[in-house]
Amino acid sequence: MMQQAIDKVIRRQDLAETEMMAVMQGIMEGKVTDSQIGGFLTALRMKGETVEEITASAKVMRSKALVVEVNQPHSIDTCGTGGDQANTFNISTAVAFVAAAAGVTVVKHGNRSVSSQCGSADVLEKLGVNIDLTPKQVETCVEQVNMGFMFAPKFHQAMKYAAAARRELGVRTIFNILGPLTNPAKVKGQVLGVFDESLTEVMAQVLKELGVERGMVVHGLDGLDEITTTTKTKVSELKNGMISNYVIDPRQFDIPLTDKEDLAGGDAEKNASIILNIVKGETGGKRNMVLINAGAAIYVGNAANSLQEGIDRAAEVIDMGLALDKLNQLIKLSQELKV
């Protein structure tokens, strides 16, 4: 099965959903060798992944994941594919606290660093959040503080079979794309940053196929997998079953352009202190970056009627100290749940 799939993809032929599901099942059940996984992932990346191939893979990964039950109709996740090589601070992690403080249920799904200096799990841990939670404990966090964090390796244990091949390859593969698509809480809304402009519409289509109701798939034209403040951003928005494509400019929202250097992060300690300063009200380029992305999260989470309204609400909750409160609530509760 694996040899045929590799051969087909090398010849730049797309796989049908059933074929892709069979390949992913084999990988997730440890039935495929590392060299086969590496060969397949490389060939697939060179061919370019289709909506069908990505959807099929996400379905298999979701079926193998531990489940988190969230009874909120507008729960969201904020994360990107990573792989933009930009080494910015953890923008989507800061955004999660702001959106939750604005009343959006945020169930964040993340990992330690893969392609950056510091992943969301690294920075949350440095901030004092206990990331080692069971599905039930994450559910408790969501019920009590309106947000929770799922540490990907704990919830996607079958991923361990692909880990060695991915590490040895060291390049972006379909797994970078799959991370944000396999949230164990099956959230209904997503702001999803992608590392490649050509992926915005593809990923919006995949979100629709997976049953997501509201989504903004974004790619900064400076290469960032976020809505950027250094230039314009391409957006594919999923709403009411329809996908619309457009470009936004931060200046439309009275946000001045920022230099990319102003968005630089560092290790977990540095990024934790950046996030802390932002939720404490520090102004400047980093705050503006969080505002525009949190605005999108608040809009997608149905707590604002437009991106502008979302941005205004984001500024309000930071300035009122509510985002800092949300961070402290998650730290306190997650530590109390330690077993």
Swiss-Prot record:
- Family, per the entry? Belongs to the anthranilate phosphoribosyltransferase family.
PANTHER family assigned to the protein according to its UniProt record, in alphabetical order: ANTHRANILATE PHOSPHORIBOSYLTRANSFERASE (PTHR43285:SF2)
Reaction catalysed by this chain?
N-(5-phospho-beta-D-ribosyl)anthranilate + diphosphate = 5-phospho-alpha-D-ribose 1-diphosphate + anthranilate
**Cofactor-binding details, from the entry:** Binds 2 magnesium ions per monomer.
Subunit note: Homodimer.
| Biochemical pathway | Amino-acid biosynthesis; L-tryptophan biosynthesis; L-tryptophan from chorismate: step 2/5
The cofactor required is: Mg(2+)
- What lineage is on file? Bacteria, Bacillati, Bacillota, Clostridia, Peptostreptococcales
Recorded protein name is Anthranilate phosphoribosyltransferase
Sites where the protein binds anthranilate 1? G80, N111
Residues bound to Mg(2+) 1 are S92, E226
- Report the protein's function: Catalyzes the transfer of the phosphoribosyl group of 5-phosphorylribose-1-pyrophosphate (PRPP) to anthranilate to yield N-(5'-phosphoribosyl)-anthranilate (PRA).
A Pfam family this protein belongs to? Glycos_trans_3N
